Design a protein with these regions (language model features):
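Conserved glycine-rich cofactor-binding loop
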Residues: 12, 19-20
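Residue(s) in the substrate-gating loop at a strand-loop-helix junction
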Residues: 153
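Substrate-binding pocket helix/loop in short-chain dehydrogenase/reductase
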Residues: 102-105, 109-114, 216
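C-terminal helical subdomain
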Residues: 193, 214-246, 253-255
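Short C-terminal tail/terminal secondary-structure segment
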Residues: 2-4, 102, 158, 218-219, ...
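Active-site helix of classical SDR
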Residues: 128, 169, 177
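Short, small/polar-rich loop/turn modules that mediate ligand/substrate recognition or access, typified
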Residues: 185, 190, 246-248
Length: 261
């Protein structure tokens, strides 16, 4: 098992939406460094597959069926994690609805807007808030530290026409995360966001490049799309003591898209 600056032995990470996509990539990054993982997701078949994959790294993995838009289920989910693992060291709020169909905000009903925010903003807020509650309690008992991570997007920085609920959820949570960094810093708890660029759901080198992939070759400073494994390292970094003085930030993992003209 890996040791050293990024060693996560004895640490526990809660990852919402951790059974696929970026959430599973975050989980792999934790597991590769010896950390235990608690996956929160509602698809039990995918949960089982993710659990089997991660256990191959020789770590403890549990899965929990949690609807993060429900405060009651979120609190209960953490109770399950504490019973199974005894502690929570990092939380990755990754669960959220996919970007909705592009549509003018003039045509978007208030209910549709609010329904989206219930999961993608309120759900992420509840996930990080209740995780912070456990970390504060642990820190007050003398075991200082913890890491809160929100998975955002480049829409936190750039205008995104036709998807106001998606952009609003990401930008709103970015502000909340910065507030968490200020409020919980005295407990040694960090709070950061990750803003992925364009990411392919497959693994490196699989399949032909799509028209969008080819477009990203000229949009990114590193001329390729992102892949799932590109996000394993940032998870290990943010969960480990290597990031103990890094808080209130948004890490853009985008192949240099944001710096291109």
């Amino acid at each position: 098992m890996a040791k050293g600056l990024f060693d996560l032995s004895g640490k526990v990470a809660v990852i919402t939406g951790g059974n696929s996509g970026l959430g599973l990539a975050f989980a792999r990054g934790i597991a590769r460094q010896g950390g235990s993982v608690a996956i929160w997701a509602r698809n039990e078949e995918k949960n089982a597959a993710a659990k089997k994959e991660l256990e191959a790294f020789g770590v403890k993995v549990t899965t929990h069926k949690v609807d993060v838009s429900s405060e009651e289920q979120t609190v209960a989910g953490y109770q399950e994690v504490m019973q199974a693992h005894g502690r929570v060291d990092s939380v990755f709020a990754n669960a959220g609805l996919p970007p909705p169909q592009t549509r003018s905000m003039l045509d978007l009903s208030t209910k549709e807007f609010q329904d989206f925010l219930n999961v993608s903003l309120t759900g992420a807020y509840l996930t990080l808030r209740e995780g912070a509650r456990l970390m504060v309690k642990r820190s007050e008992a003398g075991d200082i530290g913890g890491s809160l991570v929100f998975c955002g997007s480049l829409s936190m920085f750039k205008g995104l026409a036709g998807k106001p609920s998606y952009a609003g959820s990401k930008g709103g949570m970015g502000a909340i995360v910065r507030s968490m960094a200020v409020e919980f810093g005295k407990y040694g708890i960090r709070a950061n966001s990750v803003a992925p660029g364009y990411v392919k759901t497959g693994m490196t080198g699989t399949g032909e490049l799509s028209p969008l992939d080819k477009f990203m070759l000229i949009k990114n400073a590193i001329p390729r799309p992102g892949y799932m494994e590109d996000y394993e390292g940032v998870a290990a970094y943010l969960a480990s003591d290597a990031s103990s003085f890094h808080t209130g930030d948004t890490l853009t993992i985008d192949g240099g898209c944001m710096v291109m003209l």
